[in-house]
Amino acid sequence: VRLYIASSDDILQGRVTDIYFVRTKEILIKKGLADVRVRMEFHVNGVPRGYEWVVYSGLEDALKVLSQRPVNVYSLPEGTLIPSNYPIPLMVIEGRYVDFVELETAVLGILRHSTSVTTKAARIKRLGMDRKFIFFGLRAAHPVLAPMLDRAAYIGGFDGVSGIMSEEYLGVKPSGTMPHALIVVFGDNVEAWKAFDEVIPEDVPRIALVDTFEDERMEAIKAAKALGKKLFGVRLDTPSSRRGNFREIIMEVRWTLDLLGYKHVKIVASGGINEKSVQQLRDIVDIFGVGTSVAFPQPVDIGGDIVEVNKGGEWVPISKRGKLPGAKKVYRCSTLEYEVVPWNSTPSKCFEDVLELYLQEGRLVKKLPSPQELREYVLSQLKNLPEPTPTD
């Protein structure tokens, strides 16, 4: 019995790779091409239908992988929004190809998965900028991915994450409520709510799950009476098989709580929350718990291609068909307006150079922002954009 996971050493040493990269390295070395230097660019190749922008993330992980090799790495800042219909280089790796060839698999996997999760989180957050969102998606993926998923969702704009390792990795105190299992074990919802209040530290918000045994409205009233002013919120997580009209159920709960003097109690909704349900419920829900739709989003496709080879000390543009040869620099005018020019050219309209040097011969030369700073960076850009049209 074992866990089928790769260790950090496996990843950093290039053992998590595709066999054709290993064979490529062997061929280049044996044929005297080990010293050939290249510039490889990473671009967004495709996005889910309806996506007008993506949020680039996963850079810190990718830099960790590449820092094991003597390469230069240029990149957009992590958390940067880019338009989905314009081929903007996200990252450029410069160095001997044999020094990083087997790392392409890991770098692409990191960037694609993290960018996909962060983009979905940002789309959902943009649909409810004045609402709170907590990431509940760890149970939707292999546990080895938990820190990455929490980080990607958080920097995408989510206000909290449920994973307990988030405090260690992100400096974010984990957020959560209570499971149905707690109430089922007690066999009585009021006893379970009171036990939570008696045992759990006071700084943890009292959010009662109110759809275990009875009608949601009745359980919400019981919770409010049992905990009074200490009750921060009620969570509705009704299974879709029994939900009926979720909006009407929530409105009924809200109306009744207000009528009985419990206007301070927040409404928390979870269970199958996606872009469309956020748009439909954001006027009556204070906090959303979002899981699978963020943990397993439609993918943002990112690819890597050699665009220049150094011959005799000169960089020579070259690429496979369908790709633009030659390394490029990236300049930004505004949130989604960019200008891409050949490496040594001058831009004509955009003058903020956003493709910056992060690794020099494998050594980090630029300070990386904290998760909190990345999140604020993403939110500052989202404020400049119209709401996305929900796609799920």
Q: Over which residues does each language-model region extend?
A:
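Ordered alpha/beta subdomains of enzyme catalytic regions
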Residues: 1-204, 230, 303-392
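Glycine-rich phosphate/ribose-binding loops and adjacent secondary-structure elements
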Residues: 177, 181-338
